Amino acid sequence: MQALLFLMALLLPSGAGAEEIIGGVESRPHSRPYMAHLEITTERGYKATCGGFLVTRQFVMTAAHCKGRETTVTLGVHDVSKTESTQQKIKVEKQIVHPNYNFYSNLHDIMLLKLQKKAKVTPAVDVIPLPQPSDFLKPGKMCRAAGWGQTGVTKPTSNTLREVKQRIMDKEACKNYFHYNYNFQVCVGSPRKIRSAYKGDSGGPLVCAGVAHGIVSYGRGDAKPPAVFTRISPYVPWINKVIKGKDLTSLSLHESESPS
């Protein structure tokens, strides 16, 4: 029965409860200057929101399932209901989805957004470092996820950025997710507590010791652990090529590859 549990990508239409964290706390304003709030117009014309994070002055990383027809990124924001003096609102020039992204399995759920102009680095806006290709998170390590998604399965959203502690779990905890792939995904959660990224948090970072190691991808509809994040380390060579403007048509990342 557990294998039949409803799984969902954690993107949410705006107006239906978008952006926040379950079981977490409000972040200190602008203490996570890399956080990005994405306002998306989908291919069908609907409005949706996702999270993301600044990895260079002109590139934001997010989940591939957050791709839309048009996207505007807001940096330096804590309360999305207000126009804060720290905000930088920049339109997306290009969406670069990983060439092996699979909508049905959520594998390779990673995308880079090239901004129309470079962000200005300020105390409220800055980049976050990425891991080395050989880095691999070990079970038991404590990290944090952040976002503006729902605070509960039936609760409304909060306008302010929130964050939650997340424990890296053993791959066995995600064995009931049919398409879970340990080489490219991270299994996270707090086994005895409902602490999770949820609807609207998609694309936000999993931060461990100041480094972005994961991207919010999908989880259970009831918000119980575990949730699945895209593992960033095996994609670092691809990320570097995108940022340098190299041709991506011949690049491929095979599911059988090891990230080390």
Swiss-Prot record:
The protein's enzyme class: hydrolase
Single GO BP term: proteolysis
Name of this protein: Mast cell protease 1
Molecular function terms from GO: serine-type endopeptidase activity
Signal peptide range in chain numbering: 1-18
Family from the record: Belongs to the peptidase S1 family. Granzyme subfamily.
Chain's gene name: Mcpt1
Keywords assigned by UniProt, alphabetized: Disulfide bond, Hydrolase, Protease, Secreted, Serine protease, Signal, Zymogen
